[in-house]
Curated annotation (Swiss-Prot):
InterPro entries: Pentatricopeptide_rpt, TPR-like_helical_dom_sf. It comes from the Eukaryota. Belongs to the PPR family. P subfamily. Keywords: Repeat. It holds the Pfam family PPR. The keyword Glycoprotein does not apply. This is Pentatricopeptide repeat-containing protein At5g47360. PPR repeats lie at residues 129-163, 164-198, 199-233, 234-264, 273-307, 308-343, 344-378, 379-413, 416-450. The keyword DNA-binding does not apply. It comes from Arabidopsis thaliana.
Length: 477
């Protein structure tokens, strides 16, 4: 096969070169990082002043490069650099950068770094404000260091800094997620003593903690208290409590809570939405109580709330796992489509995928082919699952014929290059030369890129056939 063809098929990432612009940006980043890293190495006290004198433009790439250069014995300086960078008005750390800092500086494994830095601020009489301490607390949050976060919170007064609601929320969330709800509750009471009020984030953290601990009564009590501090009880909070109830297995109580949401319709604020109903439907389906799940779907429809794709997937899988017959599945799909929100294509595609995952291939293939006969376009996910299954069964010719039908329907497929390669290789191995050439031409038209290993195997398979016509077809642009 010509080298030019192999070059077109091989993934561009294996042969592309960085552009001049990318190289220039890289050099600029390295230059700034070198200057900042040099300040870190040469400074013995008040590092922040030295860093400010470098006068460089900071971005995430530069910060990452500086941290990456730090040796383990420089992690404390690296942490101070990261905190300083976050206090600048021209830069704000992303969640990704907090994660990177925790990973590079190994803060989870060496939590004492946090304490060393705070103590060094105090000894060197560095300027520390609320923003500085928030960044430290956010690092604790990212590293799941609840005890260290509480220690930092207690250090606020030493720098004449008053902790705000954001600072308390960061610590409360850590203890709530950890399951230490006594300390979290103590901190909420402490907020009241220092003139601060819990906000929606505070309550949400606590409610999540109570739900995770299975303390639904406490979660519900706290939700009712939200209004006392002008916090709106919304559908998100209700849904979280409802999810906790469903996980506990108390479905009767879940229905009671759902009824309360339906009754206390506050202009859409606490009215159940598709996510809320789907939580209850899924819980019933998991317990194989499909009839009750369908009753919840009826309630959903009666309130004018349309099911979404997730609702449809959950119900269809529930019906199939309950060994219901085809008539029951058809009835469900008709109801879902009539309610709106999901199409016939989405429902049939979901059924196909569910059946394949349940190892009920023959039924899945029948439904998939029925879709094509009825003129219903399957979605890309269903196509990918069907083609992959046919290739596993080595039914390459059947797979290719279906592939042709799908191409005619102009389906936006998620069929990846690996499936194309396996299908092409299988067609070659089984002597289906004409079909292989047609598939190869389609792949080239789509500018599809293959792994080197796949290209080599296909070339070898083509050689074994000895079909010169196929070789020439495969070489066509």
């Amino acid at each position: 096969m010509p080298n030019s063809l192999i070059s077109r098929l091989v993934s561009p990432s294996l042969r592309s070169q960085p552009s001049k612009i990318s190289a220039l940006r890289f050099l600029t980043t390295v230059s700034a990082a070198e200057r900042l890293y040099g300040q870190l190495q040469g400074c013995t006290s008040n590092l922040e002043k030295e860093l400010a004198s470098a006068n460089v433009q900071l971005d995430s790439s530069c910060i990452n490069e500086v941290l990456r250069r730090c040796d383990p014995n420089q992690f404390q300086s690296g942490l101070r650099f990261f905190i300083w960078a976050g206090t600048l008005s021209s830069h704000r750390h992303s969640a990704y950068m907090y994660t990177k800092a925790c990973d590079i500086l190994k803060i989870r494994a060496k939590p004492d770094l946090i304490k060393y830095v705070i103590e060094s601020y105090r000894k060197e009489e560095c300027f520390v404000n609320v923003k500085t301490m928030r960044i430290v607390l956010t690092l604790c949050n990212q590293a799941n260091l609840a005890d260290e976060a509480l220690w930092v919170l207690r250090k606020f007064p030493e720098f004449n800094v008053c902790a705000d609601t954001v600072a308390y929320n960061l610590v409360i969330r850590l203890f709530a997620d950890k399951g230490d709800l006594n300390i979290a509750d103590m901190l909420i009471k402490e907020m009241d003593c220092v003139g601060l009020y819990p906000d929606v984030i505070t309550y949400t953290s606590m409610i999540n903690g109570y739900c995770n601990a299975g303390k639904i009564d406490d979660a519900w009590r706290l939700a009712k208290e939200m209004s006392k501090h002008d916090c709106v009880l919304n559908s998100v909070t209700y849904s979280r409590i409802l999810e906790g109830v469903c996980k506990s297995g108390d479905m009767e109580r879940a229905l009671e809570l759902l009824a309360e949401m339906e009754k206390e319709d506050g202009g859409g604020l606490i009215s159940p939405n598709a996510v809320t109903y789907t939580l209850v439907i899924q819980a019933f389906c998991e317990k194989r109580r499909v009839e009750e799940a369908l009753l919840v779907l009826d309630r959903m429809g009666n309130r004018g709330c349309m099911p979404n794709r997730v609702t449809a997937c959950v119900l269809i899988q529930g019906v199939l796992e309950n060994d219901e017959d085809v008539k029951a599945l058809s009835k469900l799909i008709d109801k879902l489509v009539k309610l709106g929100g999901v199409s016939l294509s989405e429902c049939f595609s979901s059924a196909t995928v569910s059946l394949i995952r349940m190892k009920r291939w023959e039924e899945a293939e029948k439904i998939f082919r029925l879709m094509l006969v009825r003129g219903v376009r399957p979605d890309g996910l269903a196509c990918s699952h069907v083609f992959r299954e046919l290739c596993l069964l080595e039914r390459y010719l059947d797979c290719f014929l279906l592939y042709q039908e799908i191409e005619k329907k102009d389906v936006k497929s998620t069929i990846d290059s690996d499936i194309h390669a396996v299908l092409l290789l299988g067609l070659c191995q089984q002597g289906n030369s004409w079909e292989a050439a047609k598939l190869a031409k389609s792949m080239l038209d789509k500018k599809m890129r293959l792994k080197v290993s796949h290209v080599e195997k296909i070339i070898e398979a083509l050689k074994k056939t000895g079909d010169e016509d196929l070789m020439s077809r495969f070489s066509i642009d």
